[in-house]
């Protein structure tokens, strides 16, 4: 097959490195069939499970480069060359859950635990606002200390001081009533990765107290309330297959979230999955491109995990179709303690340094960081109970 050409062949080179000798000349016809699936996805914004599986399992460097070109066209149509920044505040690494892949899981006695005070969090917001951030993301483990009363007080305080900013929460599974209380207090968006749609796969990644069904119900509740909703999954998690990824894409297709966050699985040394192989850059980039074709108006981050597994990971994510980056506004003294996975980047730089570095990185590939709320251009439709019941698909396709 011909060598990759074009300015983004650096991305395609990773396919050859990570999947050597997989393709032969006899597969050209099959690759042409996969190309037709790409264009069907672009035109119809949907595929069947079998088509998703074939596209993911049969990906090639040439197919990837064509995908990335299409994805960039879609992103430029709706968002131009603007890259939105979110100020990430990791305010607690206490968590009641014991997910098998997570470095802040309850059973990890080697984790150095911390909680930021309300004053600390507001200080992070103040610094972020001065640096031009207009979206703050409060992320943390499921920490019982932060009751609904404490959370609503915190949300109200942030929105009172920064009414022109969007506030995103990423604090896990809560009751409908809790989600409603946060929304009433002023929260705009909520990020909750579904991690994997398949219930059996979910059970291999989590203890019995956590289920795929409850996770998905939380997402439908968030949609029902009126949040701008974000979901997503790890790429290359243990036991993951192309068929399971196809189900993830079908679920996202049904959910129609305003944001999708995906990143490679990276093992943490103090978890049961410490010896498992990490997810790959090439598959993560390929899936980013597919997500952009399926949901052209979606907000799609180039995640910190991408930057962790490759020095140019975030830039490559942007070139694959992403349009969001999330610099860390947490105090430098605690960043090294919020380690969901090993070797996380940007744990030592000050917030201003992270912002300046990202601007340089984005400018080098022809994009510009903008200081705006950066709302999704997808419509936020408040689902009724009847609507969520009708679209809340079962655990089998």
Give a label for each model feature.
Residues 87, 125, 152-156, 179, ...:
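Generic structural signal for well-ordered alpha-helices
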Residues 106-122, 128-149, 154-219, 228-235, ...:
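Core AdoMet radical
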Residues 175-182, 238-252, 308-319:
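Catalytic cores of alpha/beta
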Residues 44, 71, 99, 138, ...:
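Conserved, mostly hydrophobic/aromatic
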């Amino acid at each position: 097959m011909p060598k990759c050409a074009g300015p983004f062949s650096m991305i395609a080179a990773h396919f050859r490195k990570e999947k050597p000798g997989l393709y032969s000349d006899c597969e050209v016809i099959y690759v042409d069939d996969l190309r037709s699936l790409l264009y069907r996805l672009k035109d119809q914004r949907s595929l069947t499970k079998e088509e998703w599986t074939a596209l993911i399992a049969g990906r090639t460097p040439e197919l990837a480069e064509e995908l990335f070109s299409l994805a960039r066209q879609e992103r430029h149509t709706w968002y131009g060359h603007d890259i939105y920044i979110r100020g990430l505040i990791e305010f607690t690494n206490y968590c009641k859950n014991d997910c098998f892949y997570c470095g802040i899981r309850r059973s990890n006695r080697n984790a150095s635990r911390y909680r930021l005070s309300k004053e600390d969090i507001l200080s992070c917001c103040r610094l972020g606002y001065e640096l031009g951030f207009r979206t703050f993301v409060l992320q943390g483990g499921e920490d019982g200390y932060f009751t609904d009363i404490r959370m609503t007080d915190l949300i109200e305080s942030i929105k009172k001081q920064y009414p022109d900013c969007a506030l995103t929460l990423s604090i896990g599974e809560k009751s409908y009533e809790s989600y409603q209380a946060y929304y009433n207090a002023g929260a705009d968006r909520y990020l909750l990765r579904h991690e994997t749609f398949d219930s059996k796969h979910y059970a291999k990644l989590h203890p019995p107290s956590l289920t795929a069904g409850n996770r998905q119900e939380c997402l439908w509740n968030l949609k029902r309330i009126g949040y701008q909703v974000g979901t997503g999954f790890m790429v290359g998690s243990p036991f993951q297959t192309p068929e399971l990824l196809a189900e993830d894409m079908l679920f996202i297709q049904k959910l129609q979230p305003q944001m999708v966050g995906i990143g490679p699985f990276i093992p943490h040394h103090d978890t049961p999955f410490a010896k498992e192989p990490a997810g790959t850059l090439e598959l993560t980039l390929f899936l980013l491109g597919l997500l952009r074709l399926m949901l052209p108006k979606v907000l799609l981050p180039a995640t910190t995990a991408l930057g962790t597994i490759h020095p140019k990971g975030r830039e490559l994510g942007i070139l694959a179709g992403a349009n969001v980056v999330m610099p860390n506004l947490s105090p430098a003294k605690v960043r090294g303690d919020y380690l969901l996975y090993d070797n996380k980047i940007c744990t030592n730089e000050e917030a201003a340094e992270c912002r300046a570095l990202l601007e340089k990185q984005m400018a080098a590939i022809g994009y510009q960081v903008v200081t705006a709320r950066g709302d999704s251009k997808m419509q936020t439709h408040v689902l009724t109970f009847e609507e969520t019941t009708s679209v809340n698909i079962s655990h089998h396709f």
